[in-house]
């Protein structure tokens, strides 16, 4: 196995790093995947109308536009590990807060939560994630690293969606 890893520019430590980066990235974006998997049920779970959900979803474009300047600045000024840790904790805490207190959160609180989550995930995490991936192997194997990363995220997204579908089925099936 070690020979195979070395052939593709990895050491056992950097390959393990790639696995952790992939798992962290997918867990970070799991909240958004659930939103996309259950577009009708997600606003209902938050206790908002479809129009209010549109306001929340439009935050993504706003945060990316406003945060574009910060993307490079933050990534070059601070440690990748610190940025990824802060981003993961921020998104995790906000996701937990929304999960525990919805429905019932006011629209301004939900807007602040979505803005903060997008700031942590899109403005802080994404550039640090790409930088960590790029530094995990040599220049000759960058495509492989990104391919493995996206493959891993796809597998994890499938498993999370399968878990989500199973939870919905067992919640709804007894009522049918």
Language-model segments: what does each one mean?
Residues 8-40:
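Pair of pore-lining "gating" transmembrane helices in MFS-fold secondary transporters
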Residues 26, 106-124:
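Hydrophobic core of transmembrane alpha-helices in multi-pass small-molecule transporters
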Residues 36-52:
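Short amphipathic helix-loop junctions that connect adjacent transmembrane helices
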Residues 55-73:
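Central cavity-lining transmembrane alpha-helices of secondary-active solute carriers
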Residues 89-105:
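C-terminal ends and interior cores of transmembrane alpha-helices
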Residues 123-138:
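Intracellular juxtamembrane helix-capping segments at the cytosolic ends
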Residues 141-169:
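Glycine-rich segments within core transmembrane alpha-helices of 12-TM secondary carriers
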């Amino acid at each position: 196995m070690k020979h195979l890893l070395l052939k593709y520019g990895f050491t056992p430590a950097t390959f393990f790093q790639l696995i952790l980066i992939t798992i962290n990235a997918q867990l970070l974006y799991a909240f958004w995947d659930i939103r996309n998997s259950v577009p009708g049920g997600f606003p209902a779970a938050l206790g908002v109308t479809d129009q209010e959900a549109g306001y929340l979803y439009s935050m993504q474009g706003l945060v990316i536009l406003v945060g574009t300047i910060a993307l490079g600045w933050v990534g070059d000024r601070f440690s990748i590990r610190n940025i990824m840790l802060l981003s993961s904790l921020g998104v995790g805490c906000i996701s937990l807060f929304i999960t525990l207190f919805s429905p019932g959160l006011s629209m301004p609180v939900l807007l602040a939560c979505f803005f903060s989550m997008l700031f942590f995930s899109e403005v802080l995490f994404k550039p640090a994630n790409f930088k960590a991936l790029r530094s995990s192997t040599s220049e000759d194997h960058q495509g492989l690293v990104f391919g493995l990363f996206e493959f891993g995220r796809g597998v994890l997204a499938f498993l999370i969606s399968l878990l989500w579908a199973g939870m919905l089925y067992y919640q709804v099936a007894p009522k049918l």
